[in-house]
Amino acid sequence: MVGGKLMFPIMLNIRGRKCTVAGGGNVAERKVKTLLKYGADVTAVSPVFKDGFPNVKRLEKEYSSSDIENSFLVIAATDNKEVNQTIYNDAKKRNILVSLSDDTEHSDFILPSSKNYDDITISVSTNGKSPALAKKIRQIK
């Protein structure tokens, strides 16, 4: 449960779908890598990107509402709560699924820790409370 909400576990086909990540730091990098692993068409928006940031379409600028047009889902992973809240509001107006890296309680979705074994995918979620614990559980063989 996130903030008292039980979240519905679901597997989404994002192959070829536009997914936008706002942010250019470590958290955004992890989210981008996860989306790429599942075949998403990723656009990242940030005035600055950390060294080694994945090679995706980059909008090197401050966020604006037009950046999420036609997105299937959006992840707000900036280090600025106000910007993340603006992204949330813009996504909600457009009926776009949105995840706030700093506010799982108000997010439409969270990305669980997942491991693929051929045709089997195992996902573990602590509902945003302890991503490190979910990662440890996922790594149990």
Where are these regions (language model features)?
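Hydrophobic, well-ordered beta-alpha structural blocks that scaffold small-molecule cofactor pockets
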Residues: 2-60
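Conserved SAM/SAH-binding loop
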Residues: 61-65
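Catalytic, metal-anchored helix/loop core of enzyme active sites in primary metabolism
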Residues: 5, 78, 99, 105-106, ...
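Alpha-helix C-terminal capping/helix-to-coil transition sites in glycosyltransferase folds
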Residues: 69-71
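Adenosine-phosphate binding glycine-rich loop
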Residues: 13, 115-141
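ADP-ribose/adenylate-binding Rossmann-like module
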Residues: 73-77, 84-110
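Residue-level detector of alpha-helix initiation sites
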Residues: 25-27, 82, 128
